[in-house]
Amino acid sequence: MQQRQSILWGAVATLMWAGLAHAGEASPVDPLRPVVDASIQPLLKEHRIPGMAVAVLKDGKAHYFNYGVANRESGAGVSEQTLFEIGSVSKTLTATLGAYAVVKGAMQLDDKASRHAPWLKGSAFDSITMGELATYSAGGLPLQFPEEVDSSEKMRAYYRQWAPVYSPGSHRQYSNPSIGLFGHLAASSLKQPFAPLMEQTLLPGLGMHHTYVNVPKQAMASYAYGYSKEDKPIRVNPGMLADEAYGIKTSSADLLRFVKANIGGVDDKALQQAISLTHQGHYSVGGMTQGLGWESYAYPVTEQTLLAGNSAKVILEANPTAAPRESGSQVLFNKTGSTNGFGAYVAFVPARGIGIVMLANRNYPIEARIKAAHAILAQLAG
C-alpha cells in the first residue's frame, strides 16, 4: 500500500512539474521587453499616461508590449486589440486612399483641385493641385478651420473665399483643412463618400479589420478613453473633415500591420502601387522630406534631426520648401498624431525591416515620443 502511494505521489509530482514547465514555455519573456520597458516605463510615470500599447516589428515578427489601463473607471487593461484615437497618423491612411485613387485612374496629383469639386470652380483652387493639398503646400491653409466653420455649407464657403498667402508649392504649412480636402476630393473621384470607402475598401485591403472611422457598437468595449490634462475621460469631437484628417481609431496590432504593409508590401497590386506612391518625396524642409502622409529622413538619423523635423516650428509655422533630398537606400518614415486625449507615434525603416507603433491614451509631448521611439529603434537596428 505504501509503495502504491509513493508511486501515485511520484506520478502526481511528475505531472505537476511537467505542467509548470509547459506553462513556462507558453509565456517566455520577450527578449525585446527590457529594451522597450527601459524607454516606456519612465515615459508612463513622467507624463502620467494611464495606458499605452507598443508594437514592434523586427525580422518580420510582431512583438506587443501593453501597459496600464484603457479605462480608469472599469479598470480594463490595455491590449494590442485596444482601440486608440491616432489623430494625424490618420493622414497616412488618407494619403494611401488618395494614392489608390491615382493608381485606379480616378485622379492625378497634378489635377487642379476644382476639377474634382464643381463648387470650387472660380476659386483659388483652380490653381492648386491635389498633390499640393496632400502635402500642405497649397499656399498657407491654416492648421485648423476657424471655429465658426461648423457645417458643410460654411466649409464650402470658407474654401471658396480663401486666398493663398504664398505661391502654391512654395511653402509648407501643416494643415488639417489641406489634407482633409484632399481626402474628401479623392473619395469623390472614386464616386464614394470617404468613410465607407476607407472602412470597406482600403482598410480590409490592408488587413486592418479592427480599424474604424466610426467605431461600431460591437467594438465600443475595445475603445479606450483618452484623458485630458485635468484627467477627465474624453474622446474626439466631430468636426469638418475630421474623418479625413484625424479620425481613425485603431489598435497597435492593426497599425503594425499597416507598417508591415509599408515595409513588405501587400498582395493587391493597386494597393501596393499606392503604398509606394506615398513614400515618394515631394519636397524637403530641413532634414525632413514630405511624402504623402509620411515624413521621411535619411537613415541612420539622429535624435536631434527627428526632433527638429517634428518640432513646433515645423508643425505650426510656414516653412519654405526645397527640392526633395536624396536619401539613399535607407530611409526612416514617421508620423505623429494627437487628439485632446490621445498621443500616437509610428516610425519604420524598410531597409532594416524594423518598425514601432506607440499608442497612448494621453496627449503627451511629441519630443518624449520621439526620444523613446528613437532609442528603441536604435536597439532594434543594432
UniProtKB/Swiss-Prot annotation:
InterPro entries tied to this protein: Bact_CellWall_Synth/Modif (IPR050491), Beta-lactam-related (IPR001466), Beta-lactam/transpept-like (IPR012338), Beta-lactam_class-C_AS (IPR001586)
Signal sequence bounds: 1-23
Binding, IMP: 88, 144, 174, 336, 338, 363
Catalytic residues, chain numbering: 88 (acyl-ester intermediate)
Keyword presence, Nucleotide-binding: yes
GO-annotated molecular function: beta-lactamase activity; metal ion binding; nucleotide binding
Regulation: Inhibited by various nucleotides in vitro, including adenosine 5'-(P-acetyl)monophosphate (acAMP), inosine-5'-monophosphate (IMP) and guanosine-5'-monophosphate (GMP); IMP and GMP exhibit strongest competitive inhibition. Inhibited by the beta-lactamase-blocking agent, avibactam. Inhibited by clavulanic acid. Weakly inhibited by citric acid.
SUPFAM superfamilies associated with the record: beta-lactamase/transpeptidase-like
GO cellular component: outer membrane-bounded periplasmic space
Any Pfam family: Beta-lactamase
Quaternary structure, from the entry: Monomer.
Note: The class C beta-lactamase family has a specific amino-acid numbering system known as SANC, for structural alignment-based numbering of class C beta-lactamases, or else the simpler name structural position. A multiple sequence alignment was used to derive a consensus sequence and then the consensus was numbered taking into account insertions and deletions. This allows use of identical numbers, e.g. for active site residues, despite differences in protein length.
Protein known as: Beta-lactamase CMY-10
Species assigned in the record: Klebsiella aerogenes
Gene it is expressed from: blaCMY-10
